[in-house]
Amino acid sequence: MVHIQADGARSTAVILVAAGRGERAGASSEGPKQYRRIGGKPVIVHSLLGFADLLPQATLIVVIHPDDGALLANALAPYPQLAASLTITHGGKTRQQSVLAGLRALRNQKPDYVLIHDAVRPFFDQLMLQRIIARLDDGADAVLPAIPVTDTLKRGDEGARVVDTVARSGLFAAQTPQSFHFAKILAAHEDAASAGREDFTDDAAIAEWAGLTVHLVEGSPDNVKLTVKRDLEMADARLSHNALPDVRTGNGYDVHQLVPGDGVTLCGIFIAHDQALSGHSDADVALHALTDALLATCGAGDIGDHFPPSDPQWRGAASRIFLEHAANIVRDAGGTIMNADISLIAEAPKIGPHRQIMREKLSEILGIALERCSVKATTNEKIGFVGRGEGIAAIATATVVFQGKPQ
């Protein structure tokens, strides 16, 4: 990651505007659109992490709605260092009021530059920020990232009839972060508020009204504002497509003693035998090992944590219950089970004749394709307790893919 710094000793602040309600994106249990998840993280977190990475020396001000404190705290819970670096202030009824609140929060610090950014534009990039800072360093009072309008523009009337085709030459679509010399944009905002002007749609317009020259720099086609539900869906798809695969492997091992009996249960299949496996449940050593392997992929402890042998309710229980529980934990954590592999170590009974039905049982329990389930067996060459026929051991490996981290 390349860090961007202003020229010399100039200080920089970023105001992230996140006080909107986002009605056009529709209702969601996650809250306003800046708190909805794309690529596994809330939109606002993507934006904050971007500035923290690219402008690590900048002061970060987050302007939120007074009702959104808990939403922001929850969004930042996995990022305590980032959360500790932020200054949080409450916005007003309009974006203009919210930006002014953010500017006022910087009055004591008096940074040289301030970048004002919509929290729901998480796809700004390094090159665009470099162009903005360079233009400020060159002496510009106000810098606006923008992209040329490429669509043909039509003006319509109240009857939904085209009355004019607007020449697109010289027209640009404004983006953020809109960036300024701090003292000048603060004064412009204060003057606009004193004049009762609440009709500005962006900060560059206030700068123009105040007589500042606004300089254009090249924006980014990717730096879109997430406005409606479809925007959020497309952003999530984009991040998921670009994600680095989060492939996790868990291992499990278990062993049970053989005692006199009439058969053993392995991989959920009962096999007639002159011995049985001793255990609190049905002693299915294979499913116990695989249960631990699955739990390991998401740091969820081991089988004893979830089904303690001291609990009488699990006496004689079918071990598929344990495996199903572990699989549900993995799925609830966002994981997809890709492969389950079990190696049984036993002198007897013979596993080969039952291997296929064991694989089918694993496929059924886990809800994954048969080709993703493997059962193998070997003896211990008459060595040790397994070699003496005193027990059966199992080693299991589970492969799980979780939603990846965007690049």
Curated annotation (Swiss-Prot):
E.C. numbers: 2.7.7.60, 4.6.1.12
Family statement drawn from the similarity comment of this UniProt entry: In the N-terminal section; belongs to the IspD/TarI cytidylyltransferase family. IspD subfamily. In the C-terminal section; belongs to the IspF family.
Single GO MF annotation: metal ion binding
UniProt cross-references to Pfam families, sorted A to Z: IspD, YgbB
Region (2-C-methyl-D-erythritol 2,4-cyclodiphosphate synthase) location: 248-407
Region (2-C-methyl-D-erythritol 4-phosphate cytidylyltransferase): 1-247
Residue ranges of the TM segments: none
Name of the featured protein: Bifunctional enzyme IspD/IspF
Positions MEP for the nucleophilic attack, annotated site positions: 168, 225
Reaction equations catalysed: 2-C-methyl-D-erythritol 4-phosphate + CTP + H(+) = 4-CDP-2-C-methyl-D-erythritol + diphosphate; 4-CDP-2-C-methyl-D-erythritol 2-phosphate = 2-C-methyl-D-erythritol 2,4-cyclic diphosphate + CMP
GO biological process: isopentenyl diphosphate biosynthetic process, methylerythritol 4-phosphate pathway; terpenoid biosynthetic process
Metabolic or biological pathway: Isoprenoid biosynthesis; isopentenyl diphosphate biosynthesis via DXP pathway; isopentenyl diphosphate from 1-deoxy-D-xylulose 5-phosphate: step 2/6; Isoprenoid biosynthesis; isopentenyl diphosphate biosynthesis via DXP pathway; isopentenyl diphosphate from 1-deoxy-D-xylulose 5-phosphate: step 4/6
InterPro entries: IspD, IspD/F, IspD/TarI, ISPD_synthase_CS, MECDP_synthase, MECDP_synthase_CS, MECDP_synthase_sf, Nucleotide-diphossugar_trans
Record keyword Translocase present: no
Residues the record marks as site: Transition state stabilizer: 24, 33, 280, 379
Keywords: Isoprene biosynthesis, Lyase, Metal-binding, Multifunctional enzyme, Nucleotidyltransferase, Transferase
Organism whose genome encodes this protein: Allorhizobium ampelinum (strain ATCC BAA-846 / DSM 112012 / S4)
Cofactor requirements of the protein: a divalent metal cation
Sites where the protein binds 4-CDP-2-C-methyl-D-erythritol 2-phosphate: 254-256, 280-281, 302-304, 378-381, 385, 388
Binding-site positions, a divalent metal cation: 254, 256, 288
Keyword field contains Nucleotidyltransferase: yes
Functional summary from the UniProt entry: Bifunctional enzyme that catalyzes the formation of 4-diphosphocytidyl-2-C-methyl-D-erythritol from CTP and 2-C-methyl-D-erythritol 4-phosphate (MEP) (IspD), and catalyzes the conversion of 4-diphosphocytidyl-2-C-methyl-D-erythritol 2-phosphate (CDP-ME2P) to 2-C-methyl-D-erythritol 2,4-cyclodiphosphate (ME-CPP) with a corresponding release of cytidine 5-monophosphate (CMP) (IspF).
